[in-house]
């Protein structure tokens, strides 16, 4: 099974790390690094809503974990000058749970629902009129004497976040006036995030040190900040406290995070496909059995970054590794993937 404290997991970790994440989280769009299209659009929408003195349209934010969906929700509330109340889909088990939140909102407030794709159908039904008409339908009594009453709600903004937009029902998705997708970050933006976080934490970091951490952060700010904290530990114990490129490289190698941001679980998945299934195609269930992992763990945790980086492909016949995987491990490339090239273990993937 995947370790709950996996260093390069994009899922929120221990409470201590979550507290530090909150401390370094930007509060304004001006401080929000990366996602230029999303930032520009949200700045426009927020400015327009403020000018009309209206609540911002309901907003759906989706993308892989750790890219800043919660951060963006908090920024929206901050920029609109309103309060934010946060919850998650699994927590809202009954309509009464949702009603209690909605009836305590002030005009313009933001209700943030993480993992909104996990709302139960009965709760989702209550949410529809609340989103569309700012009304809450409540059943009073039981049996033949039961009756429905409508409560007016102040205009509010629902911000929903999900890693699996495809699991949202069409009626719920259609009620969001603003839909934003967050993409993996490039190394330059991640290096800026690392440098900013280091400054907030009072750390001395060289640009090359920030770039080394960013390079191995899998395009994810949450992972970049987690790696920064572990490199800080290494620098304080085995260095002079400053984070240089050499210190970052030594620390991350010690932590078993390679130059591509892969850890032992990523390498195990790739090598299992190469050694046991001849590079694929292999069905997801067979792969899960070979790795002793759950199917959804492979699909949601391990695969996205490997696919995004071009090491794995999904095909109608199953998963296959690409030539990049063979090059990464210094293995012969099968003829079906191109010329039979043998790479030395210490030769980089670009041949240098």
From Swiss-Prot:
Disulfide bonds: none annotated. CDD domains: AAA. It is found in: Cytoplasm. Residues 186-256 are annotated as: Small ATPAse domain (RuvB-S). It comes from the Bacteria. Residues 4-185 are annotated as: Large ATPase domain (RuvB-L). GO terms for biological process: cellular response to chromate; cellular response to selenite ion; DNA recombination; DNA repair. Pfam families: AAA_lid_4, RuvB_C, RuvB_N. The keyword Transport does not apply. Belongs to the RuvB family. Has 3 domains, the large (RuvB-L) and small ATPase (RuvB-S) domains and the C-terminal head (RuvB-H) domain. The head domain binds DNA, while the ATPase domains jointly bind ATP, ADP or are empty depending on the state of the subunit in the translocation cycle. During a single DNA translocation step the structure of each domain remains the same, but their relative positions change. This is Holliday junction branch migration complex subunit RuvB. It comes from Pseudomonas aeruginosa (strain ATCC 15692 / DSM 22644 / CIP 104116 / JCM 14847 / LMG 12228 / 1C / PRS 101 / PAO1). The gene is ruvB.
